Amino acid sequence: MAQTDLAIVIPAYKGTFLRETLESVARQTDRRFHLYIGDDCSPHGLNEIVKDFEGRIPMTYHRFDTNLGGTDLVAQWERCIALTQGEPWIWLFSDDDVMGPECVREFYEVPEDVRKNAVIHFNINIINDKSTVIKRPAEYPAQISAEEYLYLKLNGKIISYVVEFIFPRAIYDHIGGFVNFDLAWGSDFMTWLRMATESERGIMTVKPTEKAMVNWRMSTENISPNKTYAIEKRKIESLIGNAAYIRALLKQYPKHYDGVEKEFRFVKFPFGEILRNRNLFTLKEIHEFTEHYRKHVGFTTHAIVCELYILISKYLLRHER
């Protein structure tokens, strides 16, 4: 087996935690990987941080002339993956998360014939800006199908982030790269779902040990906590796109999703975001969301119920005042 079967790819922009991320890569007990860093025209002097790891990590550093992640994050992911040299497996990581020292070793412990036909997953811890573990989410089952992944994810039984999956290049090429939504909101979820659908073995989680987990950082620099009007509006539009994508996938692969194909609740999740942020939007905007949902997803009942609930709550709120 070649020494560079695994490409670890970091689309980099922020410098705050990059050194800690690279330290975690440098500490890998199994060196059968090559690291690719795609500097998204960052103003934060990333090259100076990266220089300190020359000779410690087998890597390629490339600084792009233009910033792309600010307008199309998925396109930035993909141009960084394009830096790779044909490695059969790709691990898209980040510039602020941390991998356990035995992650690469445990990846190679999965038999090659299994790896070729599965998306490989690591369990995670959630850490804060001080790198303290603040939460340990539920572990994944050892193996789950695309249908089980969808069921567990949308029922809140599991969570997932982009950095906890290693995927075969062959499947990545087959599906045409990442599913692209504005802000990359749900892009990783939809992509893992599609990859699991295309994989004979679905999603397989490596043996859960403390040294083979990924620490995902809940940082003030992430998009997730941003509750501004503009960001929330874009998130909701992307969530409606996510729901439409799931509906299309269920129709395209009915045998893969036989147990959930008729469960309408699997595509009503955009309304949770609308309800949580209803005070940010006018009734006209909420109506536009529901119309968009009806047009692209269907299931008029969900849209009507959501709109009526918000209309009544706003009416009651006005009269309470």
Stretches found by the model and what they are:
Residues 8, 145-230:
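Conserved nucleotide-sugar donor-binding catalytic segment
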Residues 87-98:
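Short beta-strand-to-loop acidic/aromatic patch adjacent to the donor-nucleotide binding site
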Residues 26-65:
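Acidic donor-binding segment of Leloir-type glycosyltransferases
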Residues 102-135:
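Conserved donor NDP-sugar-binding/catalytic core segment of glycosyltransferases
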Residues 65-85:
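Glycine-rich, basic loop-to-helix element that forms the pyrophosphate-binding segment
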Residues 14-27:
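Short, well-formed alpha-helical segments that are part of the catalytic scaffolds
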Residues 189, 211-220, 225-257, 281-294:
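Catalytic core of nucleotide-sugar-dependent glycosyltransferases
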Residues 1, 264-321:
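Membrane-interface aromatic/basic loop that binds lipid-linked glycans or pyrophosphate carriers
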